[in-house]
């Protein structure tokens, strides 16, 4: 992890530390309904306050067009108080006199949340005058919001160019896990890429075939590959117009020495609904009026066999329509298998993306994986091999 400056490198005593955090939490009737993201930033806040710094938290919330009280961070600051077990101040703006006087009242070791950065158009435009206004409020900048690191905004990228910049604890652990899984992995590396559409994961597949040893293609996107190989997929979700693209990806994989694993059997039904009448068939036997809704047990067995030789797993996307029983079976079986091997110490496992996290929670194994990233877009862009502006700004 020497590539990034961390809080261990910083002198924080009596410094105003601007911390970019992810406070985009679910809310109902002005109350936070899931505090997972608040818990994730506690180690960074505590490191700063323990070292005598003043923690000044910056974040966006929702997509307001200008000032909108329904998108205020005030209720989030209140919820954070409960998590921290201490008072958290709140300023009703993130720049200007209101913010600077509130920060000037802070004693060493105290915490304040500034109002939603997106109340100002300069945030998403990364406008120089807005960056300057934010920078004037702090001595040091810390980014602890990996989930927003793919955005070159004022509070994620602009500030890091203005002030001495460091990675927070959550950012640090995310970068360590991803570097371990893809940049300098213990091989063989097996990747699972699922989900409904090839079109949304073209760059991802193109990058992974060059980086991993085995690529398991699952979910609706596997149907596009099966169709490209001449299989009949009936009424299944399938991007027939991407057949040439699918074949190109298979050729790229072959040239790179990456083994592709596609489903060998499938759970099919005539209706897309929970508990619909279904049967397990070989991928050569899908009826014209049937749709593939999950991978079958033979496919699960093939993946298990490939896992026997793997040392690292990177997972993004489910095997089937996991939100509906019984079409969650393959996702649950493989997730539990990976979780069990990770617990036994034979596998390093990293997973990420919204559907993936939901699927692992559904299988009850999110806690068994080495690392589960809640950063949807940023996690995908990292897997695609793209430089993330918010991360690049933290390099030594």
Swiss-Prot record:
Q: Which Pfam families match?
A: PGK
UniProt cross-references to Gene3D superfamilies, sorted A to Z: Phosphoglycerate kinase, N-terminal domain
Q: Which GO terms describe its molecular function?
A: ADP binding; ATP binding; phosphoglycerate kinase activity
**Which E.C. number(s) belong to this protein?**
2.7.2.3
Question: A Gene Ontology CC term for this entry?
Answer: cytosol
* Top-level taxon of the source organism: Bacteria
Q: What coarse category fits the chief subcellular location reported for this protein?
A: cytoplasm
Its pathway is: Carbohydrate degradation; glycolysis; pyruvate from D-glyceraldehyde 3-phosphate: step 2/5
Q: What is this enzyme's catalytic activity, as reactions?
A: (2R)-3-phosphoglycerate + ATP = (2R)-3-phospho-glyceroyl phosphate + ADP
Q: Where does the chain bind substrate?
A: 22-24, 37, 60-63, 118, 151
Name of protein? Phosphoglycerate kinase
Give the originating organism.
Xanthobacter autotrophicus (strain ATCC BAA-1158 / Py2)
């Amino acid at each position: 992890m020497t590539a990034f400056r961390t809080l261990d490198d910083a002198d924080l005593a009596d410094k105003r530390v601007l911390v970019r955090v992810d406070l985009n939490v679910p809310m109902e009737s002005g109350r936070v309904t899931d505090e997972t993201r608040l818990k994730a930033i506690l180690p960074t806040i505590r490191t700063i306050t323990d070292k005598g710094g003043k923690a000044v938290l910056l974040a966006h919330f929702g997509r307001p067009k200008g000032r909108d009280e329904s998108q205020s961070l005030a209720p989030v600051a209140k919820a954070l108080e409960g998590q921290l077990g201490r008072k958290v101040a709140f300023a009703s703006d993130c720049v200007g006199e209101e913010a600077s006087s509130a920060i000037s009242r802070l004693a060493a070791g105290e915490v304040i949340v500034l109002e939603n950065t997106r109340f100002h158009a300069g945030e998403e435009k990364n406008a120089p005058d807005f960056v300057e206004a934010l920078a004037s409020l702090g001595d040091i900048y810390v980014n602890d919001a990996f989930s927003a690191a793919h955005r070159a905004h004022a509070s994620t990228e602009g500030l890091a160019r203005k002030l001495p910049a460091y990675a927070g604890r959550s950012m640090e652990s995310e970068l360590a896990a991803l570097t371990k899984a893809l940049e300098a992995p213990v091989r063989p590396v097996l990747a699972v890429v699922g989900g409904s559409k090839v079109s949304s994961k073209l760059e991802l597949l193109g990058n992974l075939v060059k980086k991993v040893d085995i690529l398991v293609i699952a979910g609706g996107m596997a149907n596009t590959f099966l169709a490209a190989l001449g299989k009949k997929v009936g009424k299944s979700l399938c991007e027939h117009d991407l057949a040439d693209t699918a074949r190109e990806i298979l050729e790229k994989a072959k040239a790179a020495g990456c083994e592709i694993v596609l489903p060998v059997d499938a759970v099919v039904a005539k209706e897309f609904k929970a508990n619909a009448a279904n049967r397990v068939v070989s991928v050569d036997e899908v009826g014209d009026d049937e749709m593939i809704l999950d991978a079958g047990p033979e496919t699960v067995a093939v993946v298990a066999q490939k896992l026997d030789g793997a040392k690292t797993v990177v997972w993004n996307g489910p095997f089937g329509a996991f939100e509906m029983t019984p079409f969650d079976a393959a996702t649950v079986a493989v997730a539990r298998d990976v979780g069990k091997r990770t617990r036994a110490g034979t596998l390093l496992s990293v997973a990420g993306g919204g559907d993936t996290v939901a699927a692992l929670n559904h299988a009850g194994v999110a806690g068994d994986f080495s690392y589960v990233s809640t950063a949807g877009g940023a996690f995908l862009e990292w897997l695609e091999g793209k430089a993330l502006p918010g991360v690049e700004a933290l390099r030594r």
